[in-house]
């Protein structure tokens, strides 16, 4: 509760109090666990507006090729990835998957979050989940550890604190625009003639977790196991198994976890 939280100052990326280097975030997470005895994980934000820095092969803060220690630390603290949300879908891009007609779902590829830096095609491979999984396998061959072996979730990222993504209970998209007849065209960000208009924002998605019971501890454990998946709205039940020792009964088993 509050007593535990008071032992740590909240992490911030704003300098000089904070840092936008992911290594410093990982150190903070480690410190939280050591000081409070609690358990934490980080879920990486949808990287489709990262302009190629979400899944790097070279550390942006050092300019050096990612090495074993970075791969181990990232895989430890970031088991999950937000693959879809209000600001576009981050699974695949038509430039990377030209033969997949589903790869152009809710594509946001004008630039970074505030549109101050335009998007270039050579950035795309390092910010979409499908190509990141491939990069992770390539890095595992070199390092023995895969930093991008993540589970996936979806979320709204609408900043409203409301669970209202369903059509029967929809309160609107981003909190930056008040309800009104012109909200559909209100830009979330704009630089010159480039802008993210209100109508272009997505209303999905959802995070699904296979947990043994509906408790915080069980849900946290399931997330650490990566027994999760993302949807863009439908509340579908999906399970995927990979291995050699399953039988036909396992395919029909609806028991979670």
Predicted regions and their residues:
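Extended, charged catalytic domains and RNA/DNA-binding interfaces, predominantly
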Residues: 1-257
């Amino acid at each position: 509760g509050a007593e535990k939280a008071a032992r740590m100052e909240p992490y911030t990326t704003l300098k000089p109090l904070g840092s936008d280097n992911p290594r410093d975030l990982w150190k903070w997470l480690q410190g939280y666990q050591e000081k409070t005895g609690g358990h934490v994980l980080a879920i990486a934000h949808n990287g489709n507006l990262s302009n190629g820095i979400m899944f790097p092969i070279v550390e942006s803060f050092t300019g050096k090729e990612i090495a074993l220690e970075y791969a181990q630390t990232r895989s430890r603290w970031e088991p999950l990835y937000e693959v879809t949300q209000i600001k576009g879908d981050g699974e695949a891009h038509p430039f990377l998957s030209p033969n997949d007609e589903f790869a152009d779902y809710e594509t946001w590829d004008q630039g970074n979050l505030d549109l101050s830096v335009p998007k270039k095609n050579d950035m795309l491979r390092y910010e979409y989940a499908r190509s990141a999984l491939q990069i992770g396998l390539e890095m595992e061959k070199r390092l023995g550890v895969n930093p991008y072996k993540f589970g996936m979730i979806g979320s709204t990222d609408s900043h409203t604190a409301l669970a209202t993504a369903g059509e029967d209970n929809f309160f609107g998209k981003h909190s930056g625009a008040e309800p009104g007849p012109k909200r559909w065209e209100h830009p979330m960000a704009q630089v010159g003639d480039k802008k993210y208009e209100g109508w272009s924002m997505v209303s999905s998605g959802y995070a699904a977790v296979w947990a043994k019971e509906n408790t915080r501890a069980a849900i946290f454990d399931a997330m650490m196991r990566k027994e999760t998946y993302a949807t863009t709205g439908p509340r579908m039940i999906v399970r995927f198994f990979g291995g050699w020792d399953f039988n036909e009964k396992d395919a029909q088993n609806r028991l979670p976890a």
